[in-house]
């Protein structure tokens, strides 16, 4: 009797567990089928007005209309983007909390040894959104008309001039470090919370130079508040065709591309990842989005999730080499 009762109990327990499992699976399937049924949040790890923020906002409105739900931009600056990345990595993998990060995402593992998340295992790339140049800008008051002028002044006072970035480990920081290594110069790094703050200090003459996202710096260049010396990409920008590349300006191997991409927690269901990917690709194909990106000096950068995640690993390897050569360490 005892054995029979025990068997019945085990059978009932197994049926209960099976029922719970089926119910949970049904809930997940329902959630995916009805996605999205509430606002979606884009976590941007830099301040409003930064290059990453501008690109995120360019596609957010279009995606919001297509999804039928608000897409809210939440700026979470700090620690080179690792604060926002950590928050997204630890969020529910349901497609409602999304990271819109820059190429600095690939550098952070090399300079922050104790990240609270694994860049590859905890976050899954959906697609890059856009690639854009950084532009080397200085205050017109400096009197530097070319990269050669700036390099001459820097080499004449090694370690005395400074340069701004949008934060330790940001794409603007990595760009500057690569340029420094290739140019053979010494300068002091001054990190800020975001691009607008860094630009303000360069305009005010408190910082000597800055590789700023072209999307943020372009209006200030056109207004004469900043002098553009070179763009970071291998080819000139259509937005500033008269401005040479850093390679054309004489610093070989200094080209750098600032990309902005979308990532989600790695456990996010594949159908939701596909939906988000498809929405971005649709947005990038629209003439209005292409026009906005073009005016920012940016270009659409569509990729499949698989290609994007492979690309991130390649970028991590390249960033690690720069970080090691430059001796970069985060706090």
Feature names for model-found ranges:
Residues 105-114, 178-182, 209-243:
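A ligand-binding cleft/hinge motif common to bilobed small-molecule-binding domains
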């Amino acid at each position: 009797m005892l054995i029979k009762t025990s068997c019945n109990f085990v059978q009932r327990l197994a049926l209960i567990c099976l029922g719970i499992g089926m119910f949970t699976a049904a809930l997940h399937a329902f959630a995916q089928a009805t996605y999205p049924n509430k606002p979606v949040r884009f976590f941007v790890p830099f301040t409003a007005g930064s290059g990453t923020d501008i690109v995120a906002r360019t596609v957010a409105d279009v995606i919001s209309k297509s999804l039928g739900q608000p897409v809210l931009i939440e700026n979470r600056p700090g620690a080179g983007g690792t604060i926002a990345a950590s928050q997204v990595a630890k969020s529910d993998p349901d497609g409602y909390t999304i990271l819109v990060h820059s190429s600095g995402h690939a550098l952070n593992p090399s300079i922050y040894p104790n990240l609270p998340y694994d860049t590859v295992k905890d976050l899954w790339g959906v697609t890059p959104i856009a690639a854009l140049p950084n532009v080397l800008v200085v205050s017109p008051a400096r009197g530097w008309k070319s990269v050669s002028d700036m390099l001459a002044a820097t080499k004449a006072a090694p370690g005395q001039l400074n340069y701004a970035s949008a934060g330790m480990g940001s794409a603007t920081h990595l760009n500057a470090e690569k340029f420094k290594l290739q140019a053979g110069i010494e300068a002091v790094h001054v990190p800020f919370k975001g691009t607008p703050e860094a630009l303000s200090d360069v305009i005010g003459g408190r910082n000597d130079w800055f590789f700023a996202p072209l999307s943020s710096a372009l209006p200030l260049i056109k207004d004469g508040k900043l002098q553009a010396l070179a763009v970071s990409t291998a080819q000139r920008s259509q937005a500033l065709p008269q401005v040479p590349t850093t390679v054309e300006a004489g610093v070989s191997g200094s080209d750098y591309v600032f990309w902005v991409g979308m990532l989600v927690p790695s456990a996010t269901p594949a159908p939701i990842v596909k939906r988000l990917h498809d929405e971005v690709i649709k947005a990038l194909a629209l003439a209005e989005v292409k026009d906005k990106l073009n005016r920012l000096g940016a270009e659409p950068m569509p990729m499949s999730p698989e290609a994007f995640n492979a690309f991130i690993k390649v970028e991590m390897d390249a960033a690690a080499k720069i970080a090691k050569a430059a001796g970069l360490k985060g706090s």
